[in-house]
Amino acid sequence: MRIIQILNTFSYGDAIGNHALTIHRELIKRNIDSKIYARVIDARVREYADLYENYIEQKDDTILYHLSSGNDLNKEILKHRCKIGLNYHNITPGEFFEEYCPDIQKNCNLGREDLKRFKDKVDFVIGVSDFNIQEIKELDFNCKLYTIPILINFNDYNQTSDSEVLKNLSDGKENILFVGRIAPNKCQEKLISDFYFYKKIYNPNSRLILVGNPDGIENYYLRLKRYVSKLKLQDVIFTGHLKFAEILSYYKKASLFVCESAHEGFCVPLVEAMYFNVPIIARDCGAIKETLGDGGIILKNYSPIETASVMNKLMNDEKVQNLMKENQNKRIEKFKTKYIMEQYLEALGCNGN
C-alpha cells in the first residue's frame, strides 16, 4: 500500500503545503510508503515531492488529493482507478473577488464547480472542519466523510524569532495583530475600522499590524491604503512578505489578535495565536468558532465601535485573559500531531500502523 498525496501547487510555508508535508513525514515514521506529487513544486520543498507527470499509478495506491482551487488537475485526478480520497480545504466563494480580481473570482467559481465532479467518484472525503464537511453534505456526496483538522507542526514555532522585529515592537505600544492574506474575504477594512475607534477612544498608544501579502489582489490592498489615509489613521502597518522568523516575532509581541474574516474553512492563524497565548477576538463565520473553541471571544454582528469596546475590556481584564490562556492551552492539545494523525491513519486505512 502506498499513500500518494497530490496537490496542484506544493508551496513552501503555506498551510496546505505544511499539512501535506507533515502527513508525509508522519507516514514515513511509521514505515508507510508515502509520496507527494504536484504540478508546481516550490524549490524549497523540491526534495520531498515529484512532478505529477511522473506519477505511475499502482493498483494498491490510495490517493489523497488536496482540493483548494480551480485547476485542470481537478479533472485529471478522477482518471485514476485506485482508491481516491479528497482532502477538502474549502474554496473561497468567487463573489468576494468580483470587484477586485476577475481572474481569482473565475478560479474560485471553477473550483467550486470542480468540487461537484468528485461526487460519487471518490471513496472518502476529509474536511478540515465541520463547516467544510457541511458543504460536502449539501452536494449529496455518497461516501465516507471525516472531519479532521489540518495538521500543524508546532515544532516550527520553536525556531528563533527575528531580533530586529522584536526590538521594534518593544517600544511600549500595544500591538493589535491579524495574520492572513490581504484579501476581501479577510475583511481587513473592518479591522481598520475597529482599530480607528479603539485608538481614538481607548488607547492612542497602539498600532495595527496586518501581516500578509496582496498576492494578486493589489486593487483591494490599494483600497485599504486609501481608507487608512481617509481616516487620517496613524500606526497601521502592512508588513508584506515576511520570513517565518519575523512572523514568529509578531506573534510573540502581539497584545491582541483580531479576526474579522467573512469566510474561513479553518483559519490556521487562530491556532497559531492560541499557541502563543495571544488574547483573541474573532467574528463568528465559517469554521472560526469550531477552530477557536473556548480559546477566544466570538462576536456576532458587532459594529466597529462595539468591537473596539470589547477590545478595550479584554485588554484591561487580566482575569479574563488568564482564563483565555488556560482555555487556549487546552485547545491546542486537540491540534497536536499525534492526536490528529491517528484520525488521518484511520481515514487512509493505515490504522494498523
What is each model feature region?
Residues R39-D42, R207-L222:
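Glycosyltransferase donor-sugar binding loop
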Residues K119-T160:
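Donor nucleotide-sugar binding/catalytic pocket of nucleotide-sugar-dependent glycosyltransferases
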Residues I126, K167-K186, I192-F195, I209:
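Conserved donor-binding/catalytic core segment of Leloir-type glycosyltransferases
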Residues Y221-A245:
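Nucleotide-activated donor-binding/catalytic signature segment of Leloir-type glycosyltransferases, i.e.
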Residues S249-A254:
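Short alpha-helical donor nucleotide-sugar binding micro-motif in glycosyltransferases
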Residues A262:
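Aromatic "clamp/platform" in nucleotide-sugar-dependent glycosyltransferases that forms part
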Residues L270, P279-A282:
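Short hydrophobic beta-strand element within catalytic cores of glycosyltransferases
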Residues I297-I305, K313-E318:
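Conserved acidic donor-binding segment of nucleotide-sugar-dependent glycosyltransferases
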